[in-house]
Amino acid sequence: MGFGRGCETTAVPLLVAVAALLVGTAGHLYPGEVCPGMDIRNNLTRLHELENCSVIEGHLQILLMFKTRPEDFRDLSFPKLIMITDYLLLFRVYGLESLKDLFPNLTVIRGSRLFFNYALVIFEMVHLKELGLYNLMNITRGSVRIEKNNELCYLATIDWSRILDSVEDNYIVLNKDDNEECGDVCPGTAKGKTNCPATVINGQFVERCWTHSHCQKVCPTICKSHGCTAEGLCCHKECLGNCSEPDDPTKCVACRNFYLDGQCVETCPPPYYHFQDWRCVNFSFCQDLHFKCRNSRKPGCHQYVIHNNKCIPECPSGYTMNSSNLMCTPCLGPCPKVCQILEGEKTIDSVTSAQELRGCTVINGSLIINIRGGNNLAAELEANLGLIEEISGFLKIRRSYALVSLSFFRKLHLIRGETLEIGNYSFYALDNQNLRQLWDWSKHNLTITQGKLFFHYNPKLCLSEIHKMEEVSGTKGRQERNDIALKTNGDQASCENELLKFSFIRTSFDKILLRWEPYWPPDFRDLLGFMLFYKEAPYQNVTEFDGQDACGSNSWTVVDIDPPQRSNDPKSQTPSHPGWLMRGLKPWTQYAIFVKTLVTFSDERRTYGAKSDIIYVQTDATNPSVPLDPISVSNSSSQIILKWKPPSDPNGNITHYLVYWERQAEDSELFELDYCLKGLKLPSRTWSPPFESDDSQKHNQSEYDDSASECCSCPKTDSQILKELEESSFRKTFEDYLHNVVFVPRPSRKRRSLEEVGNVTATTLTLPDFPNVSSTIVPTSQEEHRPFEKVVNKESLVISGLRHFTGYRIELQACNQDSPDERCSVAAYVSARTMPEAKADDIVGPVTHEIFENNVVHLMWQEPKEPNGLIVLYEVSYRRYGDEELHLCVSRKHFALERGCRLRGLSPGNYSVRVRATSLAGNGSWTEPTYFYVTDYLDVPSNIAKIIIGPLIFVFLFSVVIGSIYLFLRKRQPDGPMGPLYASSNPEYLSASDVFPSSVYVPDEWEVPREKITLLRELGQGSFGMVYEGNAKDIIKGEAETRVAVKTVNESASLRERIEFLNEASVMKGFTCHHVVRLLGVVSKGQPTLVVMELMAHGDLKSHLRSLRPDAENNPGRPPPTLQEMIQMTAEIADGMAYLNAKKFVHRDLAARNCMVAHDFTVKIGDFGMTRDIYETDYYRKGGKGLLPVRWMSPESLKDGVFTASSDMWSFGVVLWEITSLAEQPYQGLSNEQVLKFVMDGGYLDPPDNCPERLTDLMRMCWQFNPKMRPTFLEIVNLLKDDLHPSFPEVSFFYSEENKAPESEELEMEFEDMENVPLDRSSHCQREEAGGREGGSSLSIKRTYDEHIPYTHMNGGKKNGRVLTLPRSNPS
């Protein structure tokens, strides 16, 4: 286990102990290990190394896995991984669909080292559907690059500004999300709930989530980037990401600055040092890294030093290390590194000893090179000794059998000779068996100030090389006769070489065939063979001994070749030419090549040999790499402009490009889904705007001549140019990755004529089969999807003759030879969609209609012949003269069944209708209005009507006059014989007493003899009189005596009040729901009139809640309700209201005061009016009208006097607020007039302090401004059913047989009764599919306001269902 980027692959074994020490002190902050950076590619084997990692100190790259499948990742999860210190890169990992299970707890990416300025890179992940990093809270440094992921969604739902400090440099393009094809649905959205936090980006208030099941965690703004707990409490300022407890530096998930001994700190205190920008280490830790790396022979690790309170890999520029304390000290002027040889001379006998002089520029002393073996010696010696410029003493090369050349001293230019070897030698070379070259004297200068040269027993070093050194170094004439041995230097080398000449050279893209002239020494048996040397040489400046040593390290590739067979025929004059076929070469690459002989050595005669000059040969061209950066855009409805850049590896001279294109069919899912339903986002497709460049202006010149002459593109700024350079560098890096994979070029195709492109004409798309449907839609033929091809000699192409608003798949190949056997690259793919046709979505012809009985109108129209993509729905707009315009959504499937739409339940009158289609490109034009007249299906012939209409008009006028007189007298005598007028909380519950005050109550089976009722004690004052607790005999079957509540009427009550009292009791005779207070009987004979009700032992809910306050005087000793108890209350009230809703009753006055609490604490809907006098302050008289509970009323009820089940749902939300606040006054601090204005302007209550999030979400659902967006009471129960008491299913309406609706549930109503009924403005076109009746003119009110979801894509607003951003109340 290594630490630090520099040691991630080379010093791993050295640092296991250090890592173990760190893990031992990690505490609970990091439960696993600190692992080095990882590069995981090709397969999943190394991925298991992440199993125990909490921190990756370095980067994590997962890439190039082409055989993996989704099931391979299903059991892989690394929940311990919390932080990556550098960057995370994913590239071409097949089968990986989400990271939510792979890295479920990844919280921080620090970005200490970036990948081209990016800390998170997701590139060409072909199967990735979502990121899923739902615990990712901070990317401390760097940006995000997410590019070319064709299936990746849930990008628009991520608020990156909550994760990064700046989002300006993020590069998120060419993903599926860009095309608006993603139906991103955050948790709860499909069920109408708002579970995820919403934030504002670019003026849009959007929910934030990572997946359909994981919200993005958004901490309060005050927490900044410190993170917060699950409850939303801010973490300590030193935390990063999240924490388990607030304001505690030991409970952080990760540290903002540095980690030390189980807690987060701002800086490392002495004696600790900063390490890798995230943790603190002591001096011993840094020292161990330094010496273990220095003693290691493995390259790449760093000898860590101390600088500015940091443990860093090496001293910065301008500093040098003090070896005594590992501190970096500044240089004076340029920073030479003078190395003092303490004993006067230093022997270099290994790479390790050479590393001690790494970075030295001046040697104060002498060097002795005595290296007999080692790996990669030439490179290692050059890395460690290559900076030496000056030696003050002497240089001695002795018995260094591994050396071939001294070129590793590449900067040595001065040997002072202040200290000389015995015999006054400043350069000494003895017994170096393989030394063949000193330096390349054409490029190297060396001065020896004093002293002589000594050369003995260097058998392969020619004397000519030694004499050249004498001339260059200025030592010629200093040497004596025995200083340079004439017989032991060069005696085994071919110093008197003949020149070999190549006689034949032939090349291919990966081979070179060579032949050269034959060579034979005087004794042909001395020739052992030939040695062929070659290497890549971009430039023709190569020398023979570059990078060579005698231990095998050699920058040249060497091939041993046997000598040719020598003919035994002495007359033969044509000896065969030796040669070699070089294989495995790179195409279109220049190679340096030379050949020399290998001969035996003889003491008895001179050694002969031969060697060629270095020649340069280039291999042939072959298939190029893929073209770079293909971009496709559309500039019209029939054209696509394609641009690209040349391939990075042309492997020859690019001669032309091949472009193939093929029309793509639309997703089959689009044909099947009903986009009028709730939760389905309307699909759309987009096309890219044309290029804003000179070329594109040329393409569009005929179409945009005026604009082109007036506008020109602005010059790019330096920052834009820098950005493009960075992006280009990024793309080239990934091109290197592509070369790790062997691509197979496309099989050659038969060329097609370009004229065939003209046959790609606009056609309609295929419609899936619907039963009993006669469709005029023409199926798309296979011929129309055939591919087309064009040869292009430049780096752009305009493809014409395409179908409007249609997707095309385009393949692009680069070729570097124009011949029958083309050399072309693997294809680069790009997709594009043509622009829409302006009138293609317009409906052809007029809208026709047919009127049936029962006020049913069948509308019919023709589908657009060639729409933009395909039609997904139709919008029908109709209105009756004098009324508002109504809109109806007709799905594609519904239109296919009906060839139009049926309007049902229309009121008599003149109507106008118009229709428009919505395609993938948007809305078409409205048709011309069609007019029709709907008559009353009860109309009689006109001659009879004339006889009837006259008397009716007379009766109507007479009624108006009588009514006016009656109202006048009432105003003059408000306390007349009828008594004062009380506003009923539920006018629907009244009989005709308001219209016929003389009506009389008729006793029925509910009548109870007065003698069976015994009054015990007073319970409280009701709206009509006192309410008592009593006993009733034989009132419930099987019970001899029952405790009951008895309501009475005051003796002074008027006749109207007594009738209203009995009629309210009559209404309750029809209620048999466990969660509605039950009527047990009526005593109407005699005085006073009694109504016997089920006894609710704990009174009304408002009083009960207030009694549970800890400081309440009447507290019965019970604690405040728990969350479970509040959910139980909520469900019981919702179940009772659902029952009333099913009975077609609107409550109008739902509040805690009108809910009652039974002896077992079951909450039930109260007896509709009992509490009016008791809580009179909760009501408000508006404009001289009746008393109104304005603090519980919905906006539409306050504004228009409209009361529906949806307005009851608003009141239900206020009841939830009362439950969670223990019955505080809603909008406390605001007057009734202020509340009325506040609510009508879109305001609603803030949740109470410490309100459970689940109940807060329910409240906000109830307080949607648009009534149609509020849930139903049945939906509320359905949301809570899993958390209710086991007895709930046995007694509730929700689980009862009565809740199972019949096939059609409609209600006959008079037109005058429609005022208080929630009308379905969408008509019944869609309802017909659900089994509604076709006949009859009755008006259905069965939850149409909930089931028909408004289509928010059509000019949203309050009237069609957009959820608006509402102002929040601030009662305080």
From Swiss-Prot:
One Pfam family of this chain: Insulin_TMD
Enzyme Commission number(s): 2.7.10.1
CDD domains in alphabetical order: FN3, FU, PTKc_InsR
Glycosites: 43, 52, 105, 138, 242, 282, 322, 364, 424, 445, 541, 635, 653, 700, 759, 772, 910, 923
Residues with PTM Phosphoserine: 400, 407
Subcellular location: Cell membrane; Recycling endosome membrane; Late endosome; Lysosome
Listed transmembrane segments: 947-967
Cystine pairs: 35-53, 153-182, 186-209, 196-215, 219-228, 223-234, 235-243, 239-252, 255-264, 268-280, 286-311, 293-301, 315-328, 331-335, 339-360, 462-495, 676-889, 815-824
Region called PIK3R1 binding, residue ranges: 1351-1354
Cytoplasmic side of membrane: 968-1372
UniProt key word Amino-acid biosynthesis: no
Span of domain Protein kinase: 1013-1288
Main localization, broad class: membrane
Domain Fibronectin type-III: 626-728, 744-838, 843-937
Regulation affecting activity: Activated in response to insulin. Autophosphorylation activates the kinase activity. PTPN1, PTPRE and PTPRF dephosphorylate important tyrosine residues, thereby reducing INSR activity. Inhibited by ENPP1. GRB10 and GRB14 inhibit the catalytic activity of the INSR, they block access of substrates to the activated receptor. SOCS1 and SOCS3 act as negative regulators of INSR activity, they bind to the activated INRS and interfere with the phosphorylation of INSR substrates. Interacts with PTPRF.
Keyword annotations of the record: ATP-binding, Carbohydrate metabolism, Cell membrane, Cleavage on pair of basic residues, Disulfide bond, Endosome, Glycoprotein, Isopeptide bond, Kinase, Lysosome, Membrane, Nucleotide-binding, Phosphoprotein, Receptor, Repeat, S-nitrosylation, Signal, Transferase, Transmembrane, Transmembrane helix, Tyrosine-protein kinase, Ubl conjugation
Coiled coil regions, renumbered to chain: none
InterPro entries: FN3_dom, FN3_sf, Furin-like_Cys-rich_dom, Furin_repeat, Growth_fac_rcpt_cys_sf, Ig-like_fold, Insulin_TMD, Kinase-like_dom_sf
GO CC list: caveola; insulin receptor complex; late endosome; lysosome; membrane; nuclear envelope; nuclear lumen; plasma membrane
Name by which UniProt lists this protein: Insulin receptor
Gene this chain is encoded by: Insr
